[in-house]
Amino acid sequence: MIDNLFVVKVLLRRGVWRRIQLSSRHTLHDLHKAILEAYDFFDDHLYAFFMNGQPWRGEAYWSPNNDEGPYADKIKLGNLNLEIKQKFLYLYDFGDEWTFSIQVEKILETDDPVLKPIILETRGEAPEQY
């Protein structure tokens, strides 16, 4: 079965980014967990993905325990019609508002399923979360 692989660059600030590979079967919640792992953050706050790149505006997908949906754990990357160079925003911790810019760098076809997101590359030191 043919599957798509997405390679995304997750930028926190200039010089601090992570490159992550996920399959079209992974959800936005899987991407959330991979970002936190890549930046060594604890998973103890709400989050949202804003598909137009603007916080608190437009099409958004929310953490599963948020009051409103649609929920990130129900949205597969393969259903988002992502394109190369497309950018969207990940906002973590609605109090501190950690803001990450995500850019789709590659979309590859594979018949080898990727079971877990893979952190391909890191650049720059991750800041302290607290």
Where are these regions (language model features)?
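Short linear regulatory motifs enriched in tryptophan with gly/pro/ser
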Residues: 1-130
